[in-house]
C-alpha cells in the first residue's frame, strides 16, 4: 500500500496535541485575545523580523545567483559588475563573517568562478568569438579574481580537495531559514553543475507546497525531518516568529514557554541526534530505491542517472523476413543519406550504418555495383565527419578512409565492367546484376584529391617536433601508393583532364624530395651491403625520369593554365634541387612566368617563391654568385621570407588581418617536412652579397653616387659597426659581418676562417648534399674576390706588382691571377697594364689619390653651397609686394637667371678643364 494513503487520525491527534502544547493560556486570558490568537489571516500578514545575519547572507546569495545566471549565458561583462557588487556586500558583512566565519557558498563561488575564467582564458577559439566588451571584461575579471582569492587560499584549497563534503556542510550548517533562500541555493547548485560540469548528488527532494503539508500522513517521516531541520537550523528565525505569535497572545506564560523552550546543551544534543537520524534515513532511502530498481520488471519506469550514457541497441536495418535485394538496399541507403548534414545527426552512427549496409550487401551477393556506391558514400561521410574546414581528421577516421579507398580501388581493378563518372545520372545507374555493365555515379579522383588535402591538414596541425609527426609522415607512402594506383586506373579509363589532375598530385609528392640513390649512382657509388645493392637494382626509374614524363604530358595535354603553371614550377624546383642549373634556368626563362605570376592565386605564388629560392641556392652551389643574388633578392629584401614561402605567419602583421583571414592563411602553409631552411637561405644570400658588395665598395670608395647592391647586407654591416665592444662572432650574421671586414683589408685567410668553421658547417654548409664541393667553391671565390678587393684598395700604393707575388699571397694559380687582372683591365675597373716578359702589373696612376679625392669632394660641396645661397638671395630680392608689374619682375628674374647660368657654366667648365688638365699631365708623365 502506498505511503500517501496512510490514516489521518494519528496526524490529527499529533496536530491537536502540538497545538495544545504550543499555546498554553493563563487564567486572565480573554475571548478577544483567543480570537486574535486563532486569526491565521492576520498572522500571515504580519511583518517578519529577521536578524542582520539573515539579511546580509540573503543579499550575498542573491548576488551569487545573478553571477551564476550571467555565467550560464556567458555574459562576462555582467559577471564583472555583479562581482564588484558582491565584493562590496561582503565588506558590509565583515562583522558577521568575523563571528560566524566565511560562508561555504561564498568560497564555492570564488573557486568555481576562477576555474571558469581560466577555462575561458585557455579557449583561444572562444576568445576570438567574444565581443569587445566581454573580452575586455574577461581579462579584468580574471585579474581581480586572482588577486581577490589570495585572501581565501586555504578555504578554496580545502573546498577543492572535497567539494561534495563542503557542499553538504554548507547545506547543514550555513543554510538560511527562509524557503526562498533555500530555493535560491538549489538553483545556484544547478547552475554550478551545468556551468562547470561537476555532478553533485541531489540530497533533498523538492518540498511540497504549504497547503499539502497538512494533508500528509504520520508515516511521512521525511517531511517531518525536513520540517524539523527548517525549524531548527537557525534559532533566530524560530525565536523571531514565535515571539510575534506570543505578542499577539499577550500573555507572560506563553513568552516563558517560548524563551524557556530548551536548554542550550539539550538543543545542541538534539541537533546532533537529528543530523544522525536524517543521514541514516537518507542512506536507507537510497538503498530502498536501489532495491526497487533491481526488482523492476521490463516496461516499468527506469531511473536515468545524469552523466552516464545509455547503451543503445543497434537499430535493425531490415525487418525480420524481409527479402534483401538491390532495390531494398538502395532504398535503405537513401534513407540513411537523407539525415546527412542535418542538425542533430550522429555522424559516427551514420558511418556505422553504412558499414553494416555494405556488409549486408556483400553477404547477400548483390553485386559489386551496389558495393561501389555504398563505399563512395562511406568515404564521403568520413570527410563530412568534421564540418569545420579548418579541422583535421582524427587518426581512427584517417585509417578508415585509407582502408575504404584501397577497398574501392581493389573492386575497380578486379571488375572491368564497372563504369563510374560524375556525368552518370542517378536514374540511369545500373546497380543490379545483369548482362549490362555496372554504371555508378561518382568520381574516384575527387575522393583521392580530398584524401590528399586531408593528409596535408593532418601534417599542418601536428607538432613537427613530436614523434606523432613522424608517425603521420609514414602514411605518405600509402598516400602515394593510392595515387599511383589511381594513376594506372585513369590512364586506361579516365579522360585527359582527369589524367592531368592525378599527374599533378603525383608531381606534388615528388618535386621537393632529393633522390639520394640517383645521386649515388651518378657519383659511381654503390650500396655498402648486398641488400642495399639489390634494392637499388630492383627499384624503378629515377625521380628525374618520372618528373620529366609526367610534366611533359601536362605541357602537351593540359588546357588549364593553373595545372601547367604548377607543373612547370615543380619541374624547375626539381631540376634546381638536383643541381641541374642550366635546365632549370632555361625552363624558367622560356616559360615567362615572372611576367604574370602576380595574377595567380596565393598557393601558386607560394610555389613560385619556393622555386625562385631553390633556383638561387642551386646557382650558389654552382658558383654563379650574381645569379644566386638576383634570384634571392626579392624574397630576402622584403623581410617576409617566412610568410612568402608559406612557412609561418609574422606576428607584426597579425593586426592587419582578422580571424577569418588568419585561418585561410594557415591553411595555405606548407607542411614542415617541405620547408626550406631559412637560416641557410639567409646565409647564402648574405655570402653572395658579400662577394659582390665588398669589391664594389672598394672600387667606388670615393664615389658619392655609389649605389647599394644589397640593402640588407649594408644594414648588417651598420649593425656590426654600432656595437661598442666586438667579441668573437656567434650567430651566422656575425660570422658574415666579420668575414666582410676581413675581406675589405684583403685578408682572405681570416675571411675564410669566419665563413668556413665547425659552427658554420653544422648550421649551414653540411646541409647541402655536396657539402665538400660547396666549401671548395667558397674558398676559391673568397680568394678571387679578396684579390680584386686588394687591387682596388691598394692600387694607389703600388707602381707595379708581380703576378707571382699575388699568386703566392692569395694561393691562386698564376693563370687564374692573370685571368682576373685581365678582366679588370678590359672592364676598365683597374687602370693598369700587363708586362708579359716580366709578368708584372704596371699601375697607370690615372685615379686621384685619397687627398685629391677629398679636395674634389670639398670643391663640389662648396659649389653646391654657393648655388643654394644665390637661389635664396634671388628669392628674397625678387619679392617686392606687387610694386613692380609682372613684366618688370619677369625681366629681372630672366636677367638674373641668365647671369647665374653663365656663371654656373663657366665654373663647371673651369673645374672640368682643371681636372682634365691634371689627368693629361699625369698621363704624359708616364
From Swiss-Prot:
Biased composition range(s): Basic and acidic residues:
200-210
* InterPro entries per UniProt: ARM-type_fold, EIF3C, EIF3C_N_dom, PCI_dom, WH-like_DNA-bd_sf, WH_DNA-bd_sf
Molecular function GO terms recorded: RNA binding; translation initiation factor activity; translation initiation factor binding
A single Gene Ontology CC term: eukaryotic translation initiation factor 3 complex
| Basic residues bias locations | 274-283
Query: Which portions of the chain have biased composition (kind: Low complexity)?
Result: 890-919
Instruction: Give the UniProt record's GO annotations in the biological process aspect.
Output: formation of cytoplasmic translation initiation complex; translational initiation
| Bias-annotated ranges (Acidic residues) | 220-235, 287-299
Q: What ranges does the record give for the region Disordered, renumbered to this chain?
A: 1-27, 157-251, 266-300, 890-926
Where does it reside? Cytoplasm
* Record key words, sorted: Cytoplasm, Initiation factor, Phosphoprotein, Protein biosynthesis
Domain PCI per the UniProt entry, residue ranges: 672-848
Q: What does the subunit section of this Swiss-Prot or TrEMBL entry state?
A: Component of the eukaryotic translation initiation factor 3 (eIF-3) complex, which is composed of 13 subunits: eif3a, eif3b, eif3c, eif3d, eif3e, eif3f, eif3g, eif3h, eif3i, eif3j, eif3k, eif3l and eif3m.
Physiological role: Component of the eukaryotic translation initiation factor 3 (eIF-3) complex, which is involved in protein synthesis of a specialized repertoire of mRNAs and, together with other initiation factors, stimulates binding of mRNA and methionyl-tRNAi to the 40S ribosome. The eIF-3 complex specifically targets and initiates translation of a subset of mRNAs involved in cell proliferation.
Can you tell me which family this protein belongs to?
Belongs to the eIF-3 subunit C family.
The identity of this protein, by name, is Eukaryotic translation initiation factor 3 subunit C
Amino acid at each position: 500500500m502506498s505511503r500517501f494513503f496512510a490514516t489521518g487520525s494519528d496526524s490529527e491527534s499529533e496536530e491537536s496535541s502540538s497545538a495544545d502544547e504550543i499555546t498554553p493560556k493563563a487564567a486572565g486570558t480573554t475571548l478577544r485575545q483567543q480570537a486574535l490568537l486563532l486569526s491565521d489571516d492576520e498572522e500571515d500578514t504580519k511583518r517578519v523580523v529577521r536578524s542582520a545575519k539573515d539579511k546580509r547572507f540573503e543579499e550575498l546569495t542573491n548576488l551569487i545567483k545573478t553571477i551564476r545566471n550571467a555565467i550560464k549565458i556567458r555574459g562576462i561583462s555582467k559577471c564583472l559588475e555583479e562581482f564588484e557588487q558582491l565584493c562590496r556586500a561582503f565588506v558590509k558583512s565583515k562583522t558577521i563573517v568575523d563571528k560566524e566565519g566565511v560562508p561555504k557558498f561564498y568560497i564555492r563561488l570564488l573557486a568555481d568562478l576562477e576555474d571558469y575564467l581560466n577555462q575561458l582564458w585557455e579557449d583561444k577559439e572562444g576568445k576570438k568569438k567574444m565581443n569587445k566588451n566581454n573580452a575586455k571584461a574577461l581579462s579584468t575579471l580574471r585579474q581581480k579574481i586572482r588577486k581577490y582569492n589570495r585572501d581565501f587560499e586555504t578555504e578554496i584549497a580545502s573546498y577543492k580537495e572535497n567539494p561534495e563534503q563542503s557542499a553538504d556542510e554548507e547545506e547543514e550548517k550555513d543554510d538560511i531559514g527562509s524557503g526562498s533562500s533555500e530555493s535560491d541555493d538549489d538553483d545556484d547548485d544547478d547552475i554550478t553543475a551545468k556551468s562547470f560540469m561537476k555532478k553533485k548528488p541531489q540530497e533533498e527532494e523538492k518540498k511540497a507546497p504549504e497547503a499539502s503539508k497538512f494533508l500528509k500522513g504520520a508515516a511521512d517521516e521525511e517531511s517531518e525531518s525536513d520540517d524539523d531541520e527548517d525549524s531548527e537550523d537557525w534559532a533566530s528565525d524560530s525565536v523571531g516568529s514565535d515571539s510575534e505569535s506570543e505578542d499577539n497572545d499577550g500573555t507572560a506564560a506563553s513568552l516563558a514557554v517560548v524563551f524557556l523552550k530548551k536548554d542550550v546543551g539539550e538543543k545542541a544534543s538534539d541537533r546532533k541526534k537529528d543530523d544522525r537520524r536524517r543521514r541514516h534515513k537518507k542512506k536507507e532511502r537510497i538503498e530502498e530505491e536501489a532495491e526497487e530498481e533491481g526488482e523492476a520488471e521490463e516496461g516499468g519506469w527506469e531511473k536515468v542517472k545524469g552523466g552516464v550514457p545509455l547503451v543503445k541497441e543497434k537499430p535493425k536495418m531490415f525487418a525480420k523476413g524481409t527479402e534483401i535485394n538491390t532495390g531494398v538496399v538502395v532504398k535503405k541507403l537513401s534513407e540513411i543519406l537523407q539525415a546527412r548534414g542535418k542538425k542533430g545527426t550522429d555522424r559516427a552512427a551514420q558511418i556505422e550504418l553504412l558499414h553494416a549496409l555494405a556488409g549486408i550487401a556483400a553477404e547477400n551477393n548483390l553485386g559489386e555495383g551496389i558495393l561501389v556506391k555504398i563505399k563512395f558514400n562511406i568515404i564521403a561521410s568520413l570527410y563530412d565527419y568534421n564540418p569545420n574546414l579548418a579541422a583535421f581528421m582524427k587518426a581512427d577516421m584517417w585509417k578508415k578512409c585509407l582502408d575504404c579507398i584501397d577497398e574501392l580501388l581493389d573492386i575497380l581493378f578486379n571488375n572491368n565492367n564497372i563504369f563510374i563518372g560524375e556525368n552518370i545520372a542517378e536514374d540511369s545507374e545500373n546497380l543490379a546484376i545483369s548482362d549490362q555493365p555496372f554504371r555508378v555515379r561518382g568520381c574516384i579522383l575527387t575522393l583521392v584529391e580530398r584524401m590528399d588535402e586531408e593528409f596535408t591538414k593532418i601534417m599542418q596541425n601536428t607538432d613537427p617536433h613530436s614523434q606523432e609527426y613522424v608517425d603521420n609522415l609514414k602514411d605518405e607512402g600509402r598516400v602515394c601508393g593510392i595515387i599511383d594506383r589511381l594513376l594506372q586506373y585513369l590512364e586506361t579509363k579516365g579522360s585527359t583532364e582527369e589524367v592531368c589532375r592525378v599527374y599533378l598530385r603525383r608531381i606534388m609528392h615528388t618535386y621537393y624530395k632529393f633522390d639520394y640513390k640517383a645521386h649515388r649512382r651518378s657519383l659511381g657509388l654503390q650500396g655498402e651491403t648486398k641488400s642495399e645493392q639489390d634494392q637499388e637494382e630492383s627499384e624503378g626509374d629515377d625521380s628525374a625520369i618520372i618528373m620529366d614524363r609526367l610534366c611533359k604530358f601536362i605541357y602537351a595535354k593540359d588546357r588549364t593554365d593553373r595545372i601547367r603553371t604548377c607543373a612547370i614550377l615543380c619541374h624547375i624546383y626539381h631540376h634546381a634541387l638536383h643541381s641541374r642549373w642550366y635546365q632549370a634556368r632555361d625552363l624558367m626563362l622560356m616559360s615567362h612566368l615572372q611576367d604574370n605570376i602576380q595574377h595567380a592565386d596565393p598557393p601558386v605564388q607560394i610555389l613560385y617563391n619556393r622555386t625562385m629560392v631553390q633556383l638561387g641556392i642551386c646557382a650558389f652551389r654552382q658558383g654563379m654568385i650574381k645569379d644566386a643574388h638576383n634570384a634571392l633578392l626579392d624574397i630576402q629584401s622584403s623581410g617576409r621570407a617566412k610568410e612568402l614561402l608559406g612557412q609561418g605567419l609574422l606576428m607584426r602583421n597579425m593586426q592587419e588581418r582578422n580571424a577569418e583571414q588568419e585561418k585561410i592563411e594557415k591553411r595555405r602553409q606548407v607542411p614542415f617536412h617541405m620547408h626550406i631552411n631559412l637560416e641557410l637561405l639567409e646565409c647564402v644570400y648574405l655570402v653572395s652579397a658579400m662577394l659582390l658588395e665588398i669589391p664594389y665598395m672598394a672600387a667606388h670608395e670615393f664615389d658619392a653616387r655609389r649605389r647599394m647592391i644589397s640593402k640588407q647586407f649594408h644594414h648588417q654591416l651598420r649593425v656590426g659597426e654600432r656595437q661598442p665592444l666586438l667579441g668573437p662572432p656567434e650567430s651566422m650574421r656575425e660570422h658574415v659581418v666579420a668575414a666582410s671586414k676581413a675581406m675589405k683589408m684583403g685578408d682572405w685567410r681570416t675571411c675564410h676562417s669566419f665563413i668556413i668553421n665547425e659552427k658554420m658547417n653544422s648550421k649551414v654548409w653540411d646541409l647541402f648534399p655536396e657539402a665538400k664541393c660547396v666549401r671548395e667553391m667558397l674558398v676559391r671565390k673568397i680568394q678571387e674576390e679578396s684579390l680584386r678587393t686588394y687591387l682596388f684598395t691598394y692600387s694607389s700604393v703600388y707602381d707595379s706588382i708581380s703576378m707571382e707575388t699575388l699568386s703566392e699571397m692569395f694561393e691562386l694559380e698564376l693563370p687564374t691571377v692573370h685571368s682576373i687582372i685581365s678582366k679588370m683591365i678590359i672592364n676598365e675597373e683597374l687602370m693598369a697594364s700587363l708586362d708579359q716578359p716580366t709578368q708584372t702589373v704596371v699601375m697607370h696612376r690615372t685615379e686621384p689619390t685619397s687627398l685629391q679625392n677629398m679636395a674634389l669632394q670639398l670643391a663640389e660641396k662648396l659649389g653646391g653651397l654657393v648655388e643654394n645661397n644665390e637661389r635664396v638671395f634671388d628669392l628674397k630680392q625678387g619679392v617686392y609686394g606687387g610694386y613692380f608689374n609682372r613684366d618688370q619682375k619677369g625681366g629681372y628674374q630672366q636677367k638674373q637667371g641668365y647671369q647665374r647660368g653663365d656663371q654656373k657654366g663657366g665654373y663647371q667648365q673651369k673645374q672640368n678643364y682643371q681636372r682634365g688638365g691634371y689627368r693629361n699631365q699625369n698621363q704624359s708623365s708616364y
